[in-house]
Regions:
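Thiol/selenol-based redox catalytic cores and closely related redox-interacting motifs
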Residues: 14
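Asp-based, Mg2+/Mn2+-dependent phosphohydrolase catalytic module
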Residues: 3-4, 11, 20-125
Length: 125
């Protein structure tokens, strides 16, 4: 369950998406995650260049004052994986819509479900 996984993390987290702030907020609301992320939302619309450029991920790292090399990105698209790799971040790719092979080729470590992701986050490769 994504809610339990998020709550188990003791690190800063955010959402960094190519969507508008309104779209991101709506999706968080529908997933009952608004309270967990609060204002930690970064939109590709609000940076000079959207994904596959690294701008939205770099803006998030800067806002948290964290080196990109210390960030972990969870992505579900090759475009997003490319952006995170370009930002110098480690990427785990959720193979729900995009294939594991495509995510791996873009530079992600693919995972199929939240149990696998939990293992990756708590025991990084």
């Amino acid at each position: 369950d994504i809610h339990a996984l998020i709550e188990s993390l003791s690190v800063p987290i955010c959402v960094a998406s190519n969507g508008s702030r309104d779209e991101i907020t709506l999706r968080l609301k529908l997933a009952h995650l608004t309270q967990r992320f609060g204002s930690a939302i970064f939109s590709g619309v609000e940076v000079p260049h959207p994904k596959p450029a690294p701008d939205v991920f770099l803006a998030a790292a800067k806002a948290f004052n964290i080196s990109p090399a210390r960030c972990i990105v969870i992505e579900d698209s090759s475009l997003g994986v490319t952006a995170a790799v370009r930002a110098g971040m480690k990427v785990y790719g959720h193979a729900a819509v995009t294939s594991s092979a495509a995510l791996r080729e873009a530079g992600a470590i693919p995972f199929a479900n939240m149990l696998e992701l939990k293992s990756l986050l708590h025991n990084p490769l």
